[in-house]
């Protein structure tokens, strides 16, 4: 083979190896599990006070029971990632954010909405809302700083 072909082949092999290493690094290292239960204030904080905009989430599931005892789950990975990314253009991005905003609402069956189950139209009255007070809720997943 010619010198140019050998060079191109070498560069291609090196690039493929670098892509494989980057894929392994991103997908299999540095992820920390989290779990919040009903009544917990859900706060995500960067360990080194860097911008929360660099936090990423994966495999995040919000699970709750309804008053009838049925179990419901929602994948909220994109919601949490978009909340963190929303701080990217902030003048002074914070190093943490709390689910529920300034209210710092504790985790409950209404922290994330599943249409037709725990939305405003389905839970229409105060009596309906009271039935939900004792329903369990959990938020689990993985987080990391990129």
From Swiss-Prot:
<dbReference type="GO" id="GO:0044423">
    <property type="term" value="C:virion component"/>
</dbReference>
<feature type="transmembrane region" description="Helical">
    <location>
        <begin position="7"/>
        <end position="27"/>
    </location>
</feature>
<keyword id="KW-0812">Transmembrane</keyword>
<comment type="similarity">
    <text>Belongs to the asfivirus E146L family.</text>
</comment>
<keyword id="KW-0946">Virion</keyword>
<protein>
    <recommendedName>
        <fullName>Uncharacterized protein E146L</fullName>
    </recommendedName>
</protein>
<keyword id="KW-0472">Membrane</keyword>
<dbReference type="GO" id="GO:0033644">
    <property type="term" value="C:host cell membrane"/>
</dbReference>
<dbReference type="GO" id="GO:0016020">
    <property type="term" value="C:membrane"/>
</dbReference>
<keyword id="KW-1133">Transmembrane helix</keyword>
<keyword id="KW-1043">Host membrane</keyword>
